[in-house]
Amino acid sequence: MSPLFDIWHSIQHTLFPWLESELDPLTEKQQEFIRVIELAEVQKHMSPYRWQGVGRKRDDRLAILEAFVAKAVYNFPTTKMLIAYLHDSTNLRRLCGWESKGEIPSESTFSRAFEEFSRGGLGQKIHEAMVKQHAGPKLAGHVSRDATEVDVREKPFRKDPKSPEIEPKRKRGRPRQGEIIAAKEPKRLDLQLGRGLAENVADLPTRCDVGTKVNAKGYKTSWTGYKLHIDSIDGDIPISALLSSASLHDSQAAIPLAQMTAERITSLYDLMDSAYDAPQIRSYSAELGHVPIIDTNPRRGEKKEMDPAQAVRFRNRSTAERVNSNLKDNYGGRFVRVRGAAKVMTHLMFGLIAITATQLFRLLE
């Protein structure tokens, strides 16, 4: 039996019956929350957040962390709604670790704890550990890469206007003797090929700004905020995620995202839409031992059609669209009420943790 099945069997046949003997009958959402917490093993990541015996003893950070996961599972728009529900639901309150209503911390305490989790990248660490443990040992057929807009209530960063530098237009043809031609700056994609994951991620802009995309009807739409780049595998399981400024083109995060995914799982095919049609991305995918299947971008001339076999495989890319919509519709992706890239990423990661656990267990159905 697989470790994943052992965990599922223990939850279904041991943990649920015991909890229902101690609590009221569990709802479907409460059962989902329990499965997410058990698979994510969030308690293993709490050492940096425990009280060290200095100063006033603070509220239990593990209970607050589990409450934030519940916020994603229940798709609550605000922390205030979460706290109100914890006061009303004896089951969920006790599942998080608070026996009485008086033990539930204030909204400001929740906010301070969330800031601590964000500074430490706790959501990313929990998700990475869960993916490596439960998806890493298995061979993944397809990695579907995509980006989705993240709309926030934050003032966008605006660059200081600079006076345009007018360069004298040089004549076509060979340069004259002694003429010095300024070298072109290397493109980010070219630089990424020779750098590691940490350096590539650090190079991506993460300030809140304005992004623009063309929707399914061909109209341009804009939003203020960020862009979430996600790699997902068959079964609608998110494997890796990066947050960038909204204005960053999808292709600029492809290589660092591929590096992150390659550290976590072994896969065969990389599926991407025409936004990722760049020779650097194709070559890096092949360098990883993958087969890149990328919809061509008709920049010049007519659009090249895929061969029939690749076209069939490319249909699996709908995985990315389902993960994006699942995050936004069911796990808090539309209710980003925090500011700053670190906090926004933590909020979204709690949703991705819930999706990952839920979809992994669905593989057993």
Residue ranges of predicted features:
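Charge-patterned, long linear interaction tracts outside catalytic cores
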Residues: A342-E365
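Short, positively charged, Gly/Tyr-enriched micro-motifs
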Residues: K57-K125
